[in-house]
């Protein structure tokens, strides 16, 4: 775990324009790290995404709601566009950052749909995310 990458994810979270459902704005930023370098950044947004629509079936989802792009979906889309099939996803680390309005850390663990996407479609092995208690590393088994 590298706290420096969380700083970049924090900056990405400031670009989020996700207004959320139920009047609950949530700003999450993400960076993808490959071979110790940041190769992409993303954030959640009100824009819709077909990839998000595909994976929303893995969590409770109201079909009347739009499939707004989560930071994890956005970063995977960017990586796929940038690298095509040449990227070894098992060596990509995803850092996620979220904070409350007062600047304290908030939970940024991916939802069920994004966890499924990261593990099953892309083969990501490690994610790092914020919690109110600090930073967490989560590893996925084969």
What annotation goes with each model-predicted range?
Residues 1-142:
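Zinc-dependent deaminase catalytic domain
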């Amino acid at each position: 775990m590298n706290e420096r990458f969380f700083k970049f994810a924090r900056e990405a979270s400031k670009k989020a324009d996700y207004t959320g459902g139920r009047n609950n704005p949530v700003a999450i930023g993400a960076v993808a790290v490959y071979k110790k370098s940041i190769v992409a950044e993303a954030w959640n947004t009100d824009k819709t995404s077909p990839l998000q629509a595909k994976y929303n079936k893995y969590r409770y989802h109201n079909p009347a709601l739009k499939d707004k792009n989560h930071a994890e979906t956005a970063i995977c889309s960017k990586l796929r566009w940038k690298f095509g099939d040449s990227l070894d996803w098992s060596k990509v680390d995803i850092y996620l950052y979220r904070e409350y309005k007062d600047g304290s850390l908030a939970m940024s663990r991916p939802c069920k749909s994004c966890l499924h996407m990261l593990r099953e479609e892309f083969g990501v092995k490690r994610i790092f995310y914020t919690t109110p208690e600090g930073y967490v590393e989560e590893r996925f088994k084969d």
